[in-house]
Amino acid sequence: MNDFAVLSTGRKMPLLGLGTWKSEPGLVKQAVIWALESGYRHIDCAPIYANEPEIGEAFQETMGPDKGIRREDVFVTSKLWNTKHHPDDVEPSLLKTLKDLKLEYLDLYLIHWPYAFQRGDTPFPRKEDGTLLYDDIDYKLTWAAMEKLVGKGLVRAIGLSNFNSRQIDDILSVASIKPTVLQVESHPYLAQVELLSHCRDRGLVMTAYSPLGSPDRAWKHPDEPVLLEEPAIAALAKKYNKTPAQIIIRWQTQRGVVTIPKSITQSRIKENIQVFDFTLESEEMSQVTALHRGWRYIVPTITVDGKSVPRDAGHPHYPFNDPY
C-alpha cells in the first residue's frame, strides 16, 4: 500500500502527519524534530494553536540543503483563522504564518472553519456576556482570496476544514481553483462515511483530525465513550500485536484518509507511524467502521447560565446542523 494520497493537483500528500493542536510551546519544537527523525514527512499546523514560531525553529534546524531533509520532501499544512476571513486579511495572515514557520511556501492552506469571527487581532472576540462576536463574510469571497495565493506561488494547494457537504458544493460552484482537501474530525465513533464518499466523488482527499478521539481536550464530558478502550479495537490490537491507536490509524490510512494524530511523546510519535507493515482484512475494516455512533468530540462550547452549549451553533454557516 502507498503511504500517501494523491491530490487533484498531482501532488503526493503523506497519509500520516503530525498534528500540533494542543502541543504547547516548549514541547512542540522537540515533537516536530522527533517526528521528522522518525520518518514523518507531513506536519499539520495552524496559527490558532499559538505554536507556529516554535515549529518554524524545528524546521529551520532540520530542513535545508545541508540538513539532511529537503524542504520539498516535507508536506506542511496551515490554516486561515476565523478572524481573517475578510479577503483583505487572507494574504497578510498567510504571510505571518510563513514568517513564523520560516518557510517560503505552504503545501496546503485551509480555511479553518466556514464561519467568520469579527475582524481584528483578538482570536476570540467576545461580547460582555462571553458570547462571540461574529462576522457574516461569505466564505466564497474568502475562497477567491485563497485562490490568489496559489497564483502567487505562496501555497501549492488550498482546501477546507470543518465544512459540511453542502458548503463544499457551495465552494465548488464558484471555484476557479478547486479545494483539494477537506480536514474534519474523524475516528471510528465518527466514521464520516457519507462525507468521505461526497469528497471522493468531487476529487477531494479527506484528512482526519482527532483520529484517536482527542483524549486530552479541555471540555471532556464525564459520560463520553473512550475510543481507545473500545473492545473491538482491543481485540484487533491483540491479533496484530499492535496498540489500539495503531489499529485506528491503520483503519483510516487503509481507507485512504490522511491521518494527523497529535503527540508530544517520543515513543508515541514513533508508534503512530508504524502502521504500514500490516493490513486489516476487509471484514475487520467494516467492523471498525461499524463502531460509528455519530459521536463528535470536537464541538467548541461555552458556558451559558451554568450550562455547556455549542458556541457557534447559531451562526448561519455553522457546519454541524446538517446531516453531514
Curated annotation (Swiss-Prot):
Question: Would the keyword Cell membrane turn up in this protein's UniProt record?
Answer: yes
Judged by the first EC level, this protein's enzyme class is oxidoreductase
Q: Which taxonomic lineage does the organism of this UniProt entry have?
A: Eukaryota, Metazoa, Chordata, Craniata, Vertebrata
Q: What the protein does?
A: Catalyzes the NADPH-dependent reduction of a wide variety of carbonyl-containing compounds to their corresponding alcohols. Displays enzymatic activity towards endogenous metabolites such as aromatic and aliphatic aldehydes, ketones, monosaccharides and bile acids. Acts as an aldehyde-detoxification enzyme. Also acts as an inhibitor of protein S-nitrosylation by mediating degradation of S-nitroso-coenzyme A (S-nitroso-CoA), a cofactor required to S-nitrosylate proteins. Also acts as a S-nitroso-glutathione reductase by catalyzing the NADPH-dependent reduction of S-nitrosoglutathione.
Key words, A-Z: Cell membrane, Cytoplasm, Membrane, NADP, Oxidoreductase
Q: Name one GO biological process term.
A: cellular detoxification of aldehyde
Q: What is this protein called?
A: Aldo-keto reductase family 1 member A1-B
Main location (coarse class): cytoplasm
Instruction: List the record's Gene Ontology CC terms alphabetically.
Output: apical plasma membrane; cytosol
Where, per UniProt, does this protein localize?
Cytoplasm, Cytosol; Apical cell membrane
Record-annotated site: Lowers pKa of active site Tyr: 79
Catalytic machinery residues: 49
An MF annotation (GO) of this entry: aldose reductase (NADPH) activity
InterPro entries from the entry? AKR (IPR020471), AKR1A (IPR044481), Aldo/ket_reductase_CS (IPR018170), NADP_OxRdtase_dom (IPR023210), NADP_OxRdtase_dom_sf (IPR036812)
Catalytic activity from the UniProt record: a primary alcohol + NADP(+) = an aldehyde + NADPH + H(+); S-nitroso-CoA + NADPH + H(+) = sulfinamide-CoA + NADP(+); S-nitrosoglutathione + NADPH + H(+) = S-(hydroxysulfenamide)glutathione + NADP(+)
Write the gene name: akr1a1b
Sequence positions that bind NADP(+): 10-21, 44, 161-162, 210, 212, 214, 262-265, 268, 272
Give the SUPFAM superfamilies listed for this entry: NAD(P)-linked oxidoreductase (SSF51430)
Which CDD domains is this protein grouped with? AKR_AKR1A1-4
Record keyword Cell membrane present: yes
Q: Which family does it belong to?
A: Belongs to the aldo/keto reductase family.
Q: Return the Pfam families for the record.
A: Aldo_ket_red (PF00248)
